[in-house]
Amino acid sequence: MTDRYSFSLTTFSPSGKLGQIDYALTAVKQGVTSLGIKATNGVVIATEKKSSSPLAMSETLSKVSLLTPDIGAVYSGMGPDYRVLVDKSRKVAHTSYKRIYGEYPPTKLLVSEVAKIMQEATQSGGVRPFGVSLLIAGHDEFNGFSLYQVDPSGSYFPWKATAIGKGSVAAKTFLEKRWNDELELEDAIHIALLTLKESVEGEFNGDTIELAIIGDENPDLLGYTGIPTDKGPRFRKLTSQEINDRLEAL
């Protein structure tokens, strides 16, 4: 009787579940560990950059993505699904919002639009749920720094610190012990690296870790000068060398 419902996307089982969403969450749990930490002056998102082969060019792999100059995302689960969501998120931010209002959307608004896209995939014929969970970090003038988790069902929640993927249970336990209300961005980076170190198998260095921050505005990243009113982006990926320098200080 269970199989009768497990392959139906839009039919609830007698226990009140949608089997395909459970399978999508299983795909998330099989993915590498990703985490996010909110600090008083920024947000950190980080993940393991795991290559399927030592012959692969790891520098071309990217699991942390810029959605707007002040919002970034990381995922656990299926990479192709993530890339589709990144493209859709950027389209919403640029075409559906910035082109109309002249500015990028607040973090919560963009998160809700991404969640809507994911939710629609749970009740539409001919598609399947996205096999990915997202951690979206950002800053806006209304809410300051924020961190959200979006699941395949379309549910989303704000977090102080959280983790997704196969090592999420142990990572959350570690974060609960380390996080506090006065945590600053640099300390959050160290905690993120310490947390990932517990779950990463094999080499642990700047080439196998991807980490980004939402911090202060950085005019140097604009690529041009001479327009004082233009603010620099807050999203920035740390280089491999920057990560290695911090690992040496742990």
UniProtKB/Swiss-Prot annotation:
Compartment annotation: Cytoplasm; Nucleus
Disulfide bond entries: none
InterPro entries cross-referenced by the UniProt entry: Ntn_hydrolases_N (IPR029055), Proteasome_alpha (IPR050115), Proteasome_alpha-type (IPR023332), Proteasome_asu_N (IPR000426), Proteasome_sua/b (IPR001353)
Main location: cytoplasm
Gene Ontology process terms (BP): proteasomal ubiquitin-independent protein catabolic process; proteasome-mediated ubiquitin-dependent protein catabolic process
Chain positions of cross-link Glycyl lysine isopeptide (Lys-Gly) (interchain with G-Cter in ubiquitin): K108
PROSITE patterns from the UniProt entry: PROTEASOME_ALPHA_1, PROTEASOME_ALPHA_2
Entry GO CC: nucleus; proteasome complex; proteasome core complex, alpha-subunit complex; proteasome storage granule
Keyword annotations from UniProtKB, A to Z: Cytoplasm, Isopeptide bond, Nucleus, Proteasome, Ubl conjugation
Other known facts: Present with 7060 molecules/cell in log phase SD medium.
Stated family: Belongs to the peptidase T1A family.
Subunit structure as annotated in this protein's UniProt entry: The 26S proteasome consists of a 20S proteasome core and two 19S regulatory subunits. The 20S proteasome core is composed of 28 subunits that are arranged in four stacked rings, resulting in a barrel-shaped structure. The two end rings are each formed by seven alpha subunits, and the two central rings are each formed by seven beta subunits. The catalytic chamber with the active sites is on the inside of the barrel.
Protein purpose: The proteasome degrades poly-ubiquitinated proteins in the cytoplasm and in the nucleus. It is essential for the regulated turnover of proteins and for the removal of misfolded proteins. The proteasome is a multicatalytic proteinase complex that is characterized by its ability to cleave peptides with Arg, Phe, Tyr, Leu, and Glu adjacent to the leaving group at neutral or slightly basic pH. It has an ATP-dependent proteolytic activity.
The protein's name in its UniProt record: Proteasome subunit alpha type-2
Name of encoding gene: PRE8
